Amino acid sequence: MPLESIWADAPDEEPIKKQKPSHKRSNNNKKNNNSRWSNESSSNNKKKDSVNKVKNNKGNHESKTKNKIKETLPREKKPPHSQGKISPVSESLAINPFSQKATEISPPPVSPSKMKTTKTQSKQDTASKMKLLKKKIEEQREILQKTHHKNQQQQVLMDFLNDEGSSNWVDDDEEELILQRLKTSLKI
């Protein structure tokens, strides 16, 4: 007596096995520095992945992905750069419509009134710069005179201290006055 079950009517087909995801090779190897080969291998991996996706998809999605793969066109190759050859304007604009020749660019027209203002502004700028330079020169002269005067005072003091008994003073009051001035100048 055969057993009756819900599964008895099921077809005798093998279950669909899913493919394991393939591991990508890393192209970071020091020996493999050729960029052309690495680019081709990466594009091949992408193609393999898209083919695997097409096989794994079920139902209506399968036909859509196949059509997308067929519709994609290979990238257009760029023409090699011409060496010293001048191309007509139409060709350069066809390649890049935003590019312009260097000879086509001209400076914008300047009105006479604007030209006058630039000249007067430049005169004013030079006059103000000259005043500023004169001020700086005067400041530097004053600083130089002060340092020179300090050096002279220091030299006179050193001479006076080193030659303690050699100077003959006519008046003792004059000697005390000079010593007092030296002491006050050193304190400042």
Swiss-Prot record:
Basic residues: compositionally biased ranges: 18-28
Single Gene Ontology MF annotation: protein-containing complex binding
Positions of region (Disordered): 1-128
InterPro entries: mRNA_transport_factor_GFD1 (IPR020401)
Modified positions (Phosphoserine) in chain numbering: S87, S106, S111
BP GO annotations: mRNA export from nucleus; protein transport
Record membrane topology: Peripheral membrane protein
Coiled-coil zones: 119-164
UniProt biased composition (Low complexity): 29-44, 112-128
Signal peptide interval: none
Pfam families per record: GFD1
Domain of life: Eukaryota
Record field: compositional bias (Basic and acidic residues): 59-79
Annotated GO CC locations: cytoplasm; nuclear membrane; nuclear pore
Subcellular location: Cytoplasm; Nucleus, Nuclear pore complex; Nucleus membrane
Keywords assigned: Coiled coil, Cytoplasm, Membrane, mRNA transport, Nuclear pore complex, Nucleus, Phosphoprotein, Protein transport, Translocation, Transport
Task of the protein: High-copy suppressor of mutant alleles of ATP-dependent RNA helicase DBP5, which is involved in mRNA export from the nucleus. It may also play an important role in a late stage of NAB2-mRNA export.
Subunit structure comment from the entry: Interacts with GLE1, NUP42, NAB2, ZDS1 and probably DBP5. Forms a complex with GLE1 and NAB2.
Other notes: Present with 2733 molecules/cell in log phase SD medium.
Protein name (database record): mRNA transport factor GFD1
Organism lineage: Eukaryota, Fungi, Dikarya, Ascomycota, Saccharomycotina
